[in-house]
């Protein structure tokens, strides 16, 4: 199964990705985690990505595409994967289409979490305090929200035209949202 989870920063994608990936026995691949790992390791891609992340901007497509391609080529992703935070641009949609087509497979579904903007800002500010994430200041959060609406939200329309989008209300307890996702995907969660 090849899935994408979309929604604005703070919508709960990472949390839900863990449950979806566990159910389908596929890796949850988060571009945020890939970026942070490269930054921590001080790789050339990580140094470049850090400049953009610190400014609350998205990392350029060519850097992101290389990181994602390398990750989905790893053995644990051969049978499928769940992407969190990719694609974010039309060019990345086209790049991902090519990556998946090259393997002889297709994208199965896009889960789109919908969450109120004020709820998101509150979630991210709380997460910044708990996790000590320096990239989650209020100004950076609002900038990412603006970038999401401007650049990423239109991708949902592309996937809607392909009849792949399953919109799910992301407000509520984690298990409630997970149940909605499985219902949208017509999957009965295992206990």
UniProtKB/Swiss-Prot annotation:
Residues reported in the UniProt entry to bind ATP: 10-15, 127, 172
Compartments where found: Cytoplasm
PROSITE patterns: ADENYLATE_KINASE
Any one GO biological process: AMP salvage
Location of region: NMP: 30-59
GO annotation, cellular component aspect: cytoplasm
Region of interest called LID, as start-end residue ranges on this chain: 126-136
Residues that span the membrane, as ranges: none
InterPro entries documented for this protein: Adenylat/UMP-CMP_kin, Adenylat_kinase_CS, P-loop_NTPase
Catalytic activity: AMP + ATP = 2 ADP
Domains: entry comment: Consists of three domains, a large central CORE domain and two small peripheral domains, NMPbind and LID, which undergo movements during catalysis. The LID domain closes over the site of phosphoryl transfer upon ATP binding. Assembling and dissambling the active center during each catalytic cycle provides an effective means to prevent ATP hydrolysis.
Protein name (record): Adenylate kinase
Native source organism of the sequence: Nocardioides sp. (strain ATCC BAA-499 / JS614)
Gene name for this UniProt entry: adk
């Amino acid at each position: 199964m090849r899935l994408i989870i979309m929604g604005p920063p703070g919508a709960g994608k990472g949390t839900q990705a863990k449950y979806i990936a566990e159910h389908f026995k596929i890796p949850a691949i988060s571009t945020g985690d890939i970026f942070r790992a490269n930054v921590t390791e001080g790789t050339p891609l990580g140094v470049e990505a850090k400049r953009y992340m610190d400014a609350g901007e998205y990392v350029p497509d060519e850097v992101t595409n290389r990181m994602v391609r390398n990750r989905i080529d790893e053995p644990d992703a051969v049978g499928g994967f769940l992407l969190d935070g990719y694609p974010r641009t039309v060019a990345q949609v086209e790049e991902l289409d090519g990556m998946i087509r090259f393997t002889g497979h297709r994208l199965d579904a896009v889960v789109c979490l919908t969450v109120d903007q004020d709820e998101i800002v509150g979630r991210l500010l709380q997460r910044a305090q708990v996790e000590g994430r320096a990239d989650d200041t209020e100004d950076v959060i609002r900038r990412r929200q603006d970038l999401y609406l401007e650049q990423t939200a239109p991708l949902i329309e592309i996937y809607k035209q392909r009849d792949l989008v399953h919109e799910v209300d992301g407000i509520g307890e984690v298990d409630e949202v997970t149940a909605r996702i499985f219902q949208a995907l017509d999957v009965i969660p295992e206990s």
